[in-house]
Amino acid sequence: MYGAERIIFSIQYDMHTGCLHPLNDKIKLPMRHVEFMKGIFMDNITIRTAKPSDADKLLEIYAPYVEKTAITFEYEVPSVDEFRQRIENTLKKYPYIVAIKDDKIVGYAYAGTFKSRAAYDWDVELSVYLDMKCRRRGIGKLLYKKMEQILAMQNIINLNACITSPSVPDEHITDDSEKFHARMGYSLVGRFHKSGYKFDTWYDMIWMEKAISVHCTNPPAVKSFPEIEKETEKIY
C-alpha cells in the first residue's frame, strides 16, 4: 500500500541536544513517513561560517571520534587553543561551516589543501563531523551540499575525501562514510592497504573523488574564502 518501507527506531526529541534519539522498541514505517520525519528535523537547521570562538563546541563533537573511532587517525584530542588555530588557518583560504539546531552546533564541515604544489590548486580535501547523537538525519548531506556551492564560487573543481576503510567493520569503524560519499556522487579512486594503525588494528585508507566543474583549459584562478565570504551569505 505504501511502497518501500524501512525499519527504524522509535524516537524521542532531546531538548538539551536538539536531536532525535532512538528508543528501544522498533517500529516499521513507510519510507514516505521516514522522509517526512527527517524533513521536520531539518526544518530547524541553519548553516553559517564557523568562528574561532566555536572551537570548544566543535571540539566536543570531534573528541569522541578521536577517542572511540578510527574515522580519524588522530590519537590525542587536541586542545581548544590548537583547534581554534586550525579553524583560523583553514578560513584563510577555505570554507569552514557549522550546522546549528536550536542554538546548538550539531555538525561541521571544512575544506583543506589536497597538495601544496601549484598545479593542485583546484583540488581540496573535505571533512565532515556530526554530533554522535545527530547522525543519519541529513545534516552531513546538507553540509556537503553547502560546501559544494561555496567551493564552486571559489573555482574549485576536484573534491577529495580520505576515508578509513575496514576490511571487516568493527566497533571502531564501519563503511558508513564510504557509502555516504558514494550517495553524494563520489567515486572510489584508490586504496592504501593497512596504512593506518589505531586500536591495535591496521586499517586500509581509501580516496574518493568528485568533480563539481569541467576540467577546461586555462581554468579560472582559485579565489580564497575571504574573497567570496560575503557572497556565501545568500546560500546559508
Show which residues each predicted segment covers.
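A short beta-loop-alpha structural element at the N-terminal edge
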Residues: 46-58
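Conserved GNAT-fold acetyl-CoA-binding loop/helix
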Residues: 59-86
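Acetyl-CoA-dependent GNAT
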Residues: 78-133, 145, 150, 154, ...
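Conserved acetyl-CoA-binding loop-helix of GNAT-fold acetyltransferases
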Residues: 136-151, 175-179
